[in-house]
Amino acid sequence: MELLLLSNSTLPGKAWLEHALPLIANQLNGRRSAVFIPFAGVTQTWDEYTDKTAEVLAPLGINVTGIHRVADPLAAIEKAEIIIVGGGNTFQLLKESRERGLLAPMADRVKRGALYIGWSAGANLACPTIRTTNDMPIVDPNGFDALDLFPLQINPHFTNALPEGHKGETREQRIRELLVVAPELTVIGLPEGNWIQVSNGQAVLGGPNTTWVFKAGEEAVALEAGHRF
């Protein structure tokens, strides 16, 4: 499988998806036809989100079609060489994808050669479940099971920092709560600016920041760019 799982879409001082464009270009391998899954967009319309994505990726020669615009979404997924899943609200993304019957077809198409690109919520959707999203559950997705393309759980936008005086849980504390009730899981705390690239059977960590791996009953382990999962 070919996956590009990005923690986030924007870095300080850079345009939207700017840091991801070289990564996308290097993994295209001649692919040009893409479907975009905009369902995580809540405060922007799906048309706006699709147009924004198409404009940014056009210089790479990628032709982007919004899945909500086509008459036959299943046929569009079958024909797609690239499946792009945008960030936003993960619960909304999963709900809309499930209700349209797109989860199994997307997973199957990626397993048969389509490139999967997802940032933030889109990275969460590639995991076995969405249980490590940071998002508010604004809708009920009728279950947390997701695409299960990547075997570990990703927590995007990972940071353990708290504002001065804040008394809420750290991100690690929230992840530890999950591991109490689901000790079989492994969670990757993927900070902004980092990504996981899967190609030719290898999953490799990229980016300038330290990534953390959490397992039940164990201390967190720090990983740096180049680590192979």
Swiss-Prot record:
Species: Salmonella heidelberg (strain SL476)
Stored InterPro entries: Class_I_gatase-like, Peptidase_S51, Peptidase_S51_dipeptidase-E
Uppermost EC category: hydrolase
Keyword list, A-Z: Cytoplasm, Dipeptidase, Hydrolase, Protease, Serine protease
Domain of life: Bacteria
Known function: Hydrolyzes dipeptides containing N-terminal aspartate residues. May play a role in allowing the cell to use peptide aspartate to spare carbon otherwise required for the synthesis of the aspartate family of amino acids.
One Gene Ontology cellular component: cytoplasm
Biological process terms in GO annotation: proteolysis
Enzyme Commission (EC) number: 3.4.13.21
Xref: NCBIfam families: PRK05282.1
Protein name from the UniProt record: Peptidase E
